[in-house]
């Protein structure tokens, strides 16, 4: 788990008392440390209302018990209970996951609640001078004994077998009963690759629940239960694509396409098995494959660097990729018994999937990777829609669905770019780095176009999960936010509904510090939406050609 800097409390416990003048002038008092001493036998219930406390000194008293209410002090980083008469600890102490130091020296403790294993941020655990059982002492006295003991307790903590509550289906629009349309469902899911699921990153999760053999069952159960027509997955390990995902989904009537990150090209056969990438699966009953493409961002960065050091040193060094499939829609359009105009033409659908760079310090890289990907998709669509002797078709001529782990929040330049059709070439996410000369290569105007201060893409996209329908798609201890998205071209597609969030009250009641969790197999929540595809050419009704829907 990434460790924030922790400064232990000053042992001198220096304090100042405000003067009458400071009080009169409205100066606010601030105290987040408290010491209680004097051979105290019991604690006032009002203590547990001081939820702002970060440090609590309760040593050298005559306390024989600590009530479960200790869990209310959720900001505590330091708790000293040394030299008391404690014979047991409340299991609820394990919910104070902010703790960095827990001192229990010189008490009467024989056993410890396994719930202490949840204190994954602890850096100091004092247990000396307690008549603890030999199995606890044996672990504790080993090299790195504190960590081994906490891991042992977490791994052996019983987990309630209760089922996850069902996520609600949120209906946003009824299916069009007049105009012809085809409904289809799309899933987007970052499954958390095995090599990234480490105790260092996810210290709050038992090791057995991080193990891929355990997690893959929950992941496949979720994919199967969603039963989507199109499935976009990120962080799919190469070997798992061929041994798990593709065989299991092929049995259920899917075909698929997968590409690993670019680094796989320079690895041995054994090493490349563990490289992750992006996969798209589609139900063959509804779609057939026309084209498939892999977009390697580092190659595009190198080809379009235009002398920009930032492009070479920051963008080209990241080996993220995107994939796309051009599909032919099998299902006939229907609505009030009508067939679409130009029904002899194939109805195509572009589906794309990408996983952008993760580091928050590289907002410029995420934005440029997104621009490169969308620019490539625009070229693919225009080429697929072109006809001999006809002008270059509009990029919106083929319906388009984009699934991605963008590693970017809704207020980012990445989401602004996709939603609004472009961003300013001096957007703050570029970090004032010198990209201007190469960014025009990815804009609608092209390299030789007239500069207008914006980088645009020409698509008309909308997010399926608008209006904060999901409070977060990634849920870890250190970060909770929306970084996964499904976008669709609003010229041809409507969203009918989406799968809503997991009940936040359940998360709270079960003290879910972060995911993965024994009941939740990834650190991401899947997205699922039902979309409605309308044909680009609408039929004639009573001699009148219906106008465009937008």
UniProtKB/Swiss-Prot annotation:
GO terms for biological process: mRNA processing; regulation of translation; regulatory ncRNA-mediated gene silencing. Binds 2 magnesium ions, but the ions interact each with only 1 or 2 residues. Residues 1-148 are annotated as: Required for interaction with cnot1, cnot3 and cnot7. Keywords: Cytoplasm, Exonuclease, Hydrolase, Leucine-rich repeat, Magnesium, Metal-binding, mRNA processing, Nuclease, Nucleus, Repeat, RNA-mediated gene silencing, Transcription, Transcription regulation, Translation regulation. Mg(2+) 2 binds at residue 405. One of its GO terms (cellular component) is CCR4-NOT complex. LRR repeats lie at residues 52-73, 75-96, 98-120, 121-143. It is found in: Cytoplasm; Nucleus. Its main location: cytoplasm. Its EC number is 3.1.13.4. Substrate binds at residues 235, 271, 355, 360, 407, 474, 479. GO terms for molecular function: 3'-5'-RNA exonuclease activity; metal ion binding; poly(A)-specific ribonuclease activity. The keyword Protein biosynthesis does not apply. InterPro entries: CCR4/nocturin_mRNA_transcr, Deadenylase_CCR4b, Endo/exonu/phosph_ase_sf, Endo/exonuclease/phosphatase, Leu-rich_rpt, Leu-rich_rpt_typical-subtyp, LRR_dom_sf. The active site is at 405 (proton donor/acceptor). It catalyses: Exonucleolytic cleavage of poly(A) to 5'-AMP. It is an enzyme of class 3 (hydrolase). Residues 153-550 are annotated as: Nuclease domain. It comes from the Eukaryota. Mg(2+) 1 binds at residue 235. Its cofactor is Mg(2+). Poly(A) nuclease with 3'-5' RNase activity. Catalytic component of the CCR4-NOT complex which is one of the major cellular mRNA deadenylases and is linked to various cellular processes including bulk mRNA degradation, miRNA-mediated repression, translational repression during translational initiation and general transcription regulation. Additional complex functions may be a consequence of its influence on mRNA expression. Belongs to the CCR4/nocturin family. Component of the CCR4-NOT complex. This is CCR4-NOT transcription complex subunit 6-like-B. It comes from Xenopus laevis (African clawed frog). The gene is cnot6l-b.
């Amino acid at each position: 788990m990434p460790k924030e800097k922790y400064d232990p409390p000053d042992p001198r416990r220096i304090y100042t008392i405000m003067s009458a003048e400071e009080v009169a002038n409205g100066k606010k008092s601030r105290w987040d440390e408290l010491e209680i001493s004097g051979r105290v036998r019991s604690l006032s219930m009002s203590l547990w209302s001081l939820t702002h406390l970060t440090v609590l000194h309760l040593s050298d008293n005559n306390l024989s018990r600590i009530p479960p209410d200790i869990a209310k002090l959720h900001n505590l980083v330091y708790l000293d209970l040394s030299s008391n008469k404690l014979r047991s600890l409340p299991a609820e102490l394990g919910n104070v996951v902010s703790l960095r130091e827990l001192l229990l020296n010189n008490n009467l403790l024989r056993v410890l609640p396994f719930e202490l294993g949840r204190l994954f941020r602890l850096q100091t655990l004092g247990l000396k001078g307690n008549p603890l059982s030999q199995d606890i002492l044996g672990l504790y006295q080993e090299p790195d004994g504190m960590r081994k003991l906490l891991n042992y307790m977490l791994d052996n903590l019983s987990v309630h077998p209760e089922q996850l509550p069902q996520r609600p289906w949120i209906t946003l629009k009824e299916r069009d009963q007049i105009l012809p349309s085809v409904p289809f469902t799309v899933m987007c899911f970052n499954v958390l690759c095995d090599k990234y699921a480490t105790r260092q990153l996810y210290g709050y999760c038992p090791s057995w629940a991080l193990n891929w053999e355990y997690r893959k069952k929950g992941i496949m159960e979720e994919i199967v239960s969603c039963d989507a027509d199109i499935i976009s997955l990120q962080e799919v390990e190469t070997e798992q694509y061929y041994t798990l995902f593709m065989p299991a989904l092929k049995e259920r009537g899917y075909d698929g396409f997968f590409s690993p990150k670019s680094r796989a090209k320079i690895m041995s056969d054994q090493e490349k098995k563990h490289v992750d990438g992006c996969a798209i699966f589609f139900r063959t009953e509804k779609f057939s494959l026309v084209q498939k493409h892999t977009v390697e961002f580092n190659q595009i960065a190198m080809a379009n660097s235009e002398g920009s050091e930032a492009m070479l040193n920051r963008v080209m060094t990241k080996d993220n990729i995107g994939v796309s499939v051009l599909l032919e829609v099998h299902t006939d359009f229907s609505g009030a018994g009508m067939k679409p105009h130009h029904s002899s033409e194939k109805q195509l659908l572009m589906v794309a999937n990408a996983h952008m760079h993760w580091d928050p310090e590289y907002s410029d890289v995420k934005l440029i990777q997104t621009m490169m990907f969308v620019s490539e998709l625009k070229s693919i669509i225009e080429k697929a829609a072109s006809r001999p002797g006809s002008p270059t078709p509009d990029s919106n001529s083929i319906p388009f669905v984009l699934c991605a782990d963008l590693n970017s929040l809704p207020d980012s330049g990445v989401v602004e770019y996709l939603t609004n059709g472009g961003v300013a070439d001096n957007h703050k996410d570029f970090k004032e780095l010198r990209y201007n000369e190469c960014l025009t290569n990815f804009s609608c105007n092209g390299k030789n176009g007239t500069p207008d201060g914006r980088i645009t893409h020409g698509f008309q996209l909308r997010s399926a999960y608008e209006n904060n329908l999901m409070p977060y798609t990634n849920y870890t201890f250190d970060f909770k936010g929306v970084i996964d998205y499904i976008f669709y071209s609003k010229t041809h597609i409507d969203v009918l509904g989406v799968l809503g969030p997991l009940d936040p009250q359940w998360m709270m009641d079960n003290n879910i510090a972060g995911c993965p969790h024994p009941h939740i197999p990834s650190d991401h929540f899947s997205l699922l939406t039902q979309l409605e595809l309308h044909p680009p050419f609408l039929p004639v009704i009573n001699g009148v050609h219906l106008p465009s829907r937008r």
